């Protein structure tokens, strides 16, 4: 059965399906939208008690529901000094060292940091011998993405690609999954060096947004688009630890890359299969940096 599911991933018109789902998710279709939201909540056991607006009827579109805000204070930031916090609610897929420019996707599967970042070897070299973490956001999860550490935006890269589903089954069976799927890369300058936050698209992920650019929708095609931003002066964009940096309209995966020696140790519980909550302790920073 798993082999059939993987085969369907290759032959399904994923971009077409995603566009159609995106149109429906954005539509304000009244009773139809409400019925689908109610079904989704029941099917995926969404905890609406955490939402700032807990009444499903308050959401005019499925996108409004899916990108819902949480109640104030429901995800308090860990206040310890010298740490990073979890950027999302989700589950740790993999984490560990970046060795010889390779990142672990699943047992026996690796992909390159160069490919993940859109082919720029200079960008990838900034993370040589650093660390990575991959976090999967399930349908029930809160789908806004926050900063694990204060950072100043220096670059954004849009990388076109496939839209394979992103889940443990495809991670085990689709080579180079995260470096093949459509994605948006945001690179920040932090107190411990560069941080890359890679927002990976997937089947039926209608769009990816950032707080500075809105929905990232370059023209269709195979071209990689890059935007560079000032890191000093009045035009620099600095986002504080815990601030929202983006969101998925329908969910997927976040891959983070850290510079060499940025992280001293990962926090307890930051292991494959463990669930995460935005704002909890993620890692101890290297105090020597």
Swiss-Prot record:
<feature type="modified residue" description="Pyruvic acid (Ser); by autocatalysis">
    <location>
        <position position="252"/>
    </location>
</feature>
<feature type="active site" description="Schiff-base intermediate with substrate; via pyruvic acid; for decarboxylase activity">
    <location>
        <position position="252"/>
    </location>
</feature>
<dbReference type="GO" id="GO:0005886">
    <property type="term" value="C:plasma membrane"/>
</dbReference>
<keyword id="KW-0472">Membrane</keyword>
<keyword id="KW-0210">Decarboxylase</keyword>
<dbReference type="Pfam" id="PF02666">
    <property type="entry name" value="PS_Dcarbxylase"/>
</dbReference>
<keyword id="KW-1208">Phospholipid metabolism</keyword>
<comment type="function">
    <text>Catalyzes the formation of phosphatidylethanolamine (PtdEtn) from phosphatidylserine (PtdSer).</text>
</comment>
<feature type="active site" description="Charge relay system; for autoendoproteolytic cleavage activity">
    <location>
        <position position="252"/>
    </location>
</feature>
<protein>
    <recommendedName>
        <fullName>Phosphatidylserine decarboxylase proenzyme</fullName>
        <ecNumber>4.1.1.65</ecNumber>
    </recommendedName>
</protein>
<dbReference type="InterPro" id="IPR003817">
    <property type="entry name" value="PS_Dcarbxylase"/>
</dbReference>
<keyword id="KW-0865">Zymogen</keyword>
<comment type="pathway">
    <text>Phospholipid metabolism; phosphatidylethanolamine biosynthesis; phosphatidylethanolamine from CDP-diacylglycerol: step 2/2.</text>
</comment>
<dbReference type="GO" id="GO:0004609">
    <property type="term" value="F:phosphatidylserine decarboxylase activity"/>
</dbReference>
<dbReference type="InterPro" id="IPR033178">
    <property type="entry name" value="PSD_type1_pro"/>
</dbReference>
<keyword id="KW-1003">Cell membrane</keyword>
<keyword id="KW-0670">Pyruvate</keyword>
<dbReference type="GO" id="GO:0006646">
    <property type="term" value="P:phosphatidylethanolamine biosynthetic process"/>
</dbReference>
<keyword id="KW-0444">Lipid biosynthesis</keyword>
<keyword id="KW-0456">Lyase</keyword>
<comment type="similarity">
    <text>Belongs to the phosphatidylserine decarboxylase family. PSD-B subfamily. Prokaryotic type I sub-subfamily.</text>
</comment>
<dbReference type="InterPro" id="IPR033177">
    <property type="entry name" value="PSD-B"/>
</dbReference>
<feature type="active site" description="Charge relay system; for autoendoproteolytic cleavage activity">
    <location>
        <position position="146"/>
    </location>
</feature>
<feature type="active site" description="Charge relay system; for autoendoproteolytic cleavage activity">
    <location>
        <position position="89"/>
    </location>
</feature>
<keyword id="KW-0443">Lipid metabolism</keyword>
<comment type="subunit">
    <text>Heterodimer of a large membrane-associated beta subunit and a small pyruvoyl-containing alpha subunit.</text>
</comment>
<keyword id="KW-0594">Phospholipid biosynthesis</keyword>
<feature type="site" description="Cleavage (non-hydrolytic); by autocatalysis">
    <location>
        <begin position="251"/>
        <end position="252"/>
    </location>
</feature>
């Amino acid at each position: 059965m798993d082999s059939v599911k993987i085969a369907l991933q290759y032959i399904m018109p994923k971009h077409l399906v995603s566009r159609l789902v995106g149109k429906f998710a954005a539509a304000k279709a009244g009773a139809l939208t409400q019925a689908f939201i109610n079904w989704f909540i029941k099917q995926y056991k969404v905890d609406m008690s955490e939402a700032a607006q807990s009444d499903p009827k308050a959401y005019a579109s499925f996108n409004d529901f899916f990108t819902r805000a949480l109640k104030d204070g429901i995800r308090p930031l860990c206040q310890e000094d010298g740490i990073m916090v979890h950027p999302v609610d989700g589950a740790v897929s993999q984490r560990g060292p970046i060795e010889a420019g390779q990142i672990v996707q699943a047992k026996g599967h690796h992909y390159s940091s160069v490919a993940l970042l859109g082919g720029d070897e200079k960008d990838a070299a900034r993370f040589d011998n650093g660390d990575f973490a991959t976090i999967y956001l399930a349908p029930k999860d809160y789908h806004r993405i926050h900063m694990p550490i204060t950072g100043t935006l220096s670059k954004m890269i849009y990388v076109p690609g496939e839209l394979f589903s992103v889940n443990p089954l495809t991670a085990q069976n689709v080579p180079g999954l995260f470096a093949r799927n459509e994605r948006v890369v945001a690179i920040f300058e932090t107190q411990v060096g560069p941080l890359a936050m890679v927002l990976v698209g997937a089947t039926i992920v209608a769009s990816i947004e950032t707080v500075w650019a809105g929905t990232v929708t370059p023209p269709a095609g195979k071209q990689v688009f890059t935007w560079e931003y000032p890191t000093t002066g009045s035009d620099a964009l600095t986002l504080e630890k815990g601030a929202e940096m983006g969101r998925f309209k329908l969910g997927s995966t976040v891959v983070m890359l850290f510079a060499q020696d940025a992280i001293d140790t990962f926090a307890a519980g930051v292991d494959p299969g463990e669930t995460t909550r935005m704002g909890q302790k993620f890692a101890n920073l290297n105090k020597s940096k």
